[in-house]
Structures are given as structure tokens and as C-alpha cells.
Amino acid sequence: MVKVTSLKENQQVYVLHTYPFKETSLIVEIFSKEFGRVSLVAKGARRPKSALRGMLQSFQALEASWSGIGELKTLHGIDWCDQYLPMEGNSLICGFYLNELLLRLLPKEDNYESLFNFYHTTMENLSQGINIEVTLRRFELKLLLELGYEVVLKADANSNEIKADKTYYYEAEQGALEKFRTEKSIKVIGQTLIDMGNDNFDSATTELQSKNLMRFLINYYLGDKPLNSKQLFLNI
């Protein structure tokens, strides 16, 4: 775990979520390039004339400074560090979904620089409306990989090469199996796994089955508590 024990200045961050704290402040959950997910208190941010109030926007690349040695740090300043990325419609819904995944699955104060950079690119793609479903699948795969839950796509659970014409039953902790063993698995054809492993989502079948597979795996790692954004992205 990365220990945040002193003033951290000009850190690249994204705001994942904010919520009220006491009478005039906010708790700000951020994803930072160097320190991963960090919880900050923005003192007085809910006051009408607060300089922080208009800056704490999700999906925008920001620079923040904070200090503290406990789990809840104190935010000292925040500013834009890139051009504004407009988010609307499905892109906005997807942004909320990805932010909630990070809040739910990322441990606090661990460095995920590679994932941060991937998130940055993902936000740019979403703001431009670039193939939203494929953008989601790529981020979901990257997130699980960074968390140590790699989705193995080129070999089955017995280390045999995936065959395009075979049907598999994918289990979260085992991978692709040729025979059905449990209800906690999802049916997928070999060609879909091969396509995903090659970052190829052109096929309509692959697009649909990859969505179902990733939804199944994400739900497995989330556990019993559903996402708050679930109703928003059911059709994504």
C-alpha cells in the first residue's frame, strides 16, 4: 500500500464521486495517477462562493493537492489540467458505471498508474462517442487484469488452446471449461473468446457474448451488492 503521509501537490486525478459531509463540506473520492483511490474532504466546498465547488467534476482531468495521514485526507486545491470533455447521453451513463466500478473494486491507496492512463484514454473515447460498447469491454478487461483477475481468453482451464467451433462454459475462478459444471458459469463460443483475446469486437455475436461474459464476471467480483448505476446501463 502506498502511504500518503505528507502534502501531495499537483497530482493528476479524476473525481469519481462526491457526497455531503457535515454542513458545508464534501467527501471527494478520487482516482489519482500515483496514489490510486483516495478519499478527501473538501472543506467548505458546498458554500455558494467556494472556489472548489465548480471544480469537483467527474470525467475531467484535474490536478489536486492534499495532505493527511489518516484514511480521510484534506483537499487543499484542485484545478483543470486538460481541455473539458463533454459527457452526455450514453457516454455519461457509461462514465457513471465505470466510476462506480472503480469505487467498488479498487482498494484504497494502491498505485494503479497503468489503469489510470487507460481510464484517461477511456474518458476521451467516451466523450467522443467512439464505439461505446467496445470501449466498455476494453476497460472492464483492463480493470480485472489490474486487480489480478485476468480473463484468460486464449486457453481453456486445462491450458488447451481455445477452439473457435467449440462451446465453453466460463467460470470466474476457473476460466473456460468444455463441460458444464455449475450454474455459476456462462455459455460462450470459442470464437468469441478468440476475438476478445485479439481485441476484435467486429462480429455481432462477439459483441453480444462479450458483453454478457463481462457482465457475468463483473457481477461475480462485485458480490451480492448490485451497482447503483445498474438501471442506467442495463441496455449498454
Model-derived features: where do they sit?
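Non-catalytic alpha-helical scaffolds and adjoining flexible linkers that form interface surfaces
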Residues: M1-L26, F31-I236
